[in-house]
Each structure stands twice: as C-alpha cells, then as structure tokens.
C-alpha cells in the first residue's frame, strides 16, 4: 500500500481517438422462384413463363434494383417410384440485386404473391 501514497514520479497521459465515416450499404442479393407441376409439359411451362413475365414487369422498373432470370428447368415427375411419367415440373428463378434493402424488401413482399423466396443475403 505504500505505492498508493507516494506521488507519481512521471507524467501520465491518456489518449483516445475516434473516427466516423458513412459507408455504402452492402450489396443485397435475393433469389425468388416459381415452380409449377402438371400433367402436360406445355401447360406447366406456360404457367412458369406467365408468373416470371409478371414478376419481371414489376421488378424491371424498380430503381436501383438489377434483375436477372436464372436457370429454367423442366423435368418429369414419376409415379410411385416407377419409370412411368405421371406429370411434369418446371422451375425458373429470378435474381434481384441492389443496395437499397428497403426497396428490395418491398419488392420481395410484392413478388411473393406468385413467387417463393429461395434466398436473401
């Protein structure tokens, strides 16, 4: 305890610093999709194409949001683990990219009327 009562024999300096800088929002990417199933391949494809055209009509005019259609797949559905084709399934994805999280979030909410969310990140 002797050191507590002795005066300091050196100068003591406290330093602190801070900096602040506004940075741009991170890039937000969302992928949505439509998937349809039915007996006739042409009918399934038409429903997928109609849903994607609707989504693109809404998404393309959105300021600051880049849109891109992704893979389009059509494949058979088999009955009860057999080799007999019982129908068809088709799927197409839509990629949205931008820095305005609020605008992308609102667009996703609207698009969920006909598309499902695959990922947001």
Stretch-by-stretch model annotation:
Residues 2-121:
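Short, charged, surface-exposed interaction patches
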């Amino acid at each position: 305890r002797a050191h507590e009562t002795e005066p300091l024999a050196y100068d003591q300096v406290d330093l602190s610093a801070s900096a602040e800088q506004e940075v741009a929002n991170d890039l937000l990417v969302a992928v949505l999709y439509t998937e349809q199933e039915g007996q006739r391949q042409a009918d399934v494809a038409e429903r997928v194409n109609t849903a994607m055209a609707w989504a693109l009509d809404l998404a393309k005019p959105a300021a600051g949001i880049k849109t891109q259609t992704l893979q389009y797949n059509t494949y058979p559905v088999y009955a009860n683990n057999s080799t007999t084709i019982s129908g068809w399934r088709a799927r197409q994805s839509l990629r949205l990219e931008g820095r305005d999280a609020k605008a992308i979030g609102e667009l996703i909410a609207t698009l969920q009327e006909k598309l499902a969310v695959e990922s947001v990140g």
